[in-house]
């Protein structure tokens, strides 16, 4: 497998956004928001699922990831302007949005603030807003923590570990594509990871209660990263939300992605 061609959108302020397109060229348009951290380059089983779908998925790197220009101090709601520009460049007047984990709030921002263009929103293993009483994160301390976690992950890879930590698999170090994905996320993407964490810990810049488009929320029964409390909160505060539960952890198998893609296509 080789990664799809990377495209670059130049913004009027001199910044760029990098993205890849997956799925059939005539498919139903969807803008996909990566988890935190992640990359526009996806692992083979997910690429196969996107290829089977009836969707044309634009997977972009938020500022600070993958060569997309960093934007220090960005908020979750700032993703709306990026998505509007990306959709305009594709000629998409209307489209759906999808977000996994830390990408979930960014997809929900589009559902809330681009309701005239967003048809539906799917969220996988999404997080809820931070507790207002929680102490603010300090960037320097957070950057140190991110660097430590990234070093641990890449150390596991150097020792012959698989790309995904969800189970046994071939050594990622022997797969150039896997190594490219890992380096993009855990070596070159730490600015984006830090900025995501800061944005998620601050007010998001929109009200969940104002969302009017259909929202599907998927969570795993054994998610060790994001507890069921997050999905419960989102279901309570988003008037149009419907919940779906699958057996498994934070990263589901291809069948769940197939289900999500089918849901998006039929809304």
Please identify what each model-predicted range represents.
Residues 240-267:
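Catalytic active-site module of serine/aspartate enzymes centered on a nucleophile-bearing elbow/loop
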Residues 141-206:
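Alpha/beta-hydrolase
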Residues 15-69:
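Conserved HGGG/HGGXW glycine-rich cap/lid loop of the alpha/beta-hydrolase fold
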Residues 211, 217-219:
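Short beta-strand/loop motif that positions the catalytic acidic residue
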Residues 120-152:
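Flexible "cap/lid" loop of the alpha/beta hydrolase fold
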Residues 78-96:
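Conserved acidic catalytic loop of the alpha/beta-hydrolase fold
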């Amino acid at each position: 497998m080789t990664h799809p061609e990377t495209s670059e959108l130049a913004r009027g302020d001199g910044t760029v956004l990098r993205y890849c397109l997956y799925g059939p060229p005539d498919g139903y348009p969807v803008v996909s928001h990566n988890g935190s951290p992640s990359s526009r380059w996806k692992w083979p089983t997910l690429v196969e699922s996107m290829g089977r779908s009836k969707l044309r998925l634009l997977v972009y790197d938020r500022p600070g990831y993958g060569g997309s220009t960093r934007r220090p101090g960005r908020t979750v709601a700032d993703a709306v302007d990026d998505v509007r520009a990306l959709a305009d460049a594709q000629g998409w007047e209307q489209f759906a949005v999808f977000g996994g984990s830390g990408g979930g709030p960014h997809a929900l921002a589009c559902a809330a603030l681009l309701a005239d263009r967003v048809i539906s929103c799917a969220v996988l293993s999404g997080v809820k807003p931070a507790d207002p009483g929680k102490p603010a994160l300090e960037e320097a301390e957070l950057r140190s923590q991110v660097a430590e976690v990234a070093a641990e992950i890449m150390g596991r890879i150097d020792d012959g570990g698989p790309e995904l930590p969800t189970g046994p698999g071939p050594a990622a170090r022997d797969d150039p594509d896997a190594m490219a994905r890992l380096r993009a996320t855990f070596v070159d993407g730490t600015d984006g990871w830090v900025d995501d964490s800061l944005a998620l810990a601050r007010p998001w810049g929109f009200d969940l209660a104002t969302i009017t488009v259909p929202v599907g929320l998927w969570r795993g029964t054994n998610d060790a990263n994001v507890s069921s409390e997050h999905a419960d909160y989102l279901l309570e505060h988003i008037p149009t939300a419907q919940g779906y539960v699958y057996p498994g952890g934070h990263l589901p198998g291809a069948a769940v992605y197939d289900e999500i893609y089918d849901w998006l296509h039929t809304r």
